[in-house]
Structures are given as C-alpha cells and as structure tokens.
C-alpha cells in the first residue's frame, strides 16, 4: 500500500461511498481494495489537515449533478459550468488545481496495473477524484475531467452511454467545439500533424482526442479518421510523435502539502503530526519544510 508503519495504528473515521471505477480500469478485486484503502487513508489525512487549518471545502453547487442525454446537452452543461466557475472558454491552466478550488478532493497514487482514474464521494459529502500519478500531461488532464463528468452527470444511462458522455464532457472542457472550429475552420480533406501539435500544446489535449472531436464535428470524415488510426497502428514513428506529450512533467497539486505546512506554521500541529499526515519520515519533513525566517 506504500504507507508508513503509523498507518496501521491510525483510527479511520472517514467512510468511502459511491466510488465508481473508470470503465477502462483493469483493476482486479485485490487491486481495487488496495486502491480504496489508499484513498481512505489519504482522505482521512486530508480532512485532518483541513481541520487543523480551518480551511473549508467549497460546495460544488446545488445545480449538480445534472441530467444530460446527448451531445448538445453536454456542450450546454460545459458552458454553464465554465460560467459558474468563472474560467471562460479559454485554455485551462492546471486542471487539478481548478478542481480543488471548486470543492473536489484530488488524490494521486502510484499504480501501474492499467488504472487511469476513479471518482466518488466521501461520506456522501466530499467529491473525490483519484488519478494514476504516472499518466502524462494530456492523459492526466483528460482523465481528471472525465472523472469530473462522472461526478457532475446524473447516472440515468447504461455504463457505455455514461462513458461516452464523460468523454464528450472532458473534451469540451479542454477545448470547446466552437473554439476548435474557429481554429481549424470547416471540413478539411487532409490532416497536418503540425497544426494539431500547436492546438495540443496550447490547450493540453492529446492529438488522438482532438482527432476524435474533429470526426464528431465533421471537420474530418469517418473514413479519414479510420485511415489515420490504421496509419498510426502501422507507423511506429508516427505513433511516437502523436503520443508524445507536450510537457515533460504532468500537472500535480501542492494543496495538501501546503495545508500541512500552514498548519505547522500556525502551531496547530506538531512536526511528528505533520510527518504522519504527509506519510513521510521526520528526516524527509525537515528537508521538505525549510523555514526562511521566524517571528
């Protein structure tokens, strides 16, 4: 589980409910239980840090979850959400930080067994998103927003339809249909990777996700999309270029560490408590928190 010895003696006061694994996840029952326990432990420590600092988690709003049934409803929902969160129809900054600013607890874990992300609720109060730390920049952003879709979209469809709606939601959050059409124009016959790389670099969305969106909007034909998939499958050099991330490091969050640091600076917790919350040794804690001055 990658936890300290102290973990086994901690009292767990937080119960995890309504955790829905991403359909793409290939976690078996043992791995799923291990992930659930890591989530349980992290959320407990997260809430303890919140309590120590007096910070409140903002509510995501009474308008969510929302019932949607088709593509048009998803586009409308994303516009409404961006307006409510005051993020506009522009390239999104750090997606994880945006989610945390609006009441979502985001947890990153180390797992290499086909797990991308999951979402759910803690005690039916706090929405959570769990991400595989090893995902690259574009994949982590898309997965985080896909899981946000699971939180904000009412479950009134079968699993396959929900996955499709969440994929549409994530893509629309990263770059709206209107914005993409403004950039690329109308229907085209050919696809030039250079142009898509520019959009990828500006909006933090993968080339594959862009091409899927272009097919859906009719910018490229279904046959052109299939031809691209075939070429990518057979051309290692193309595949490597398409799947190359625009950034060497994926997005992450420093909110939890910053909360513990603030609690420590307020003398709300001891150094040993800070180390326990962060699940690190005292030596690592001293290396992490180097005071510049004391009053």
Regions found by a protein language model. Give the residues of each.
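Active-site hotspot residues in diverse enzymes, especially metal/ion-binding acidic/histidine motifs
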Residues: 1-295
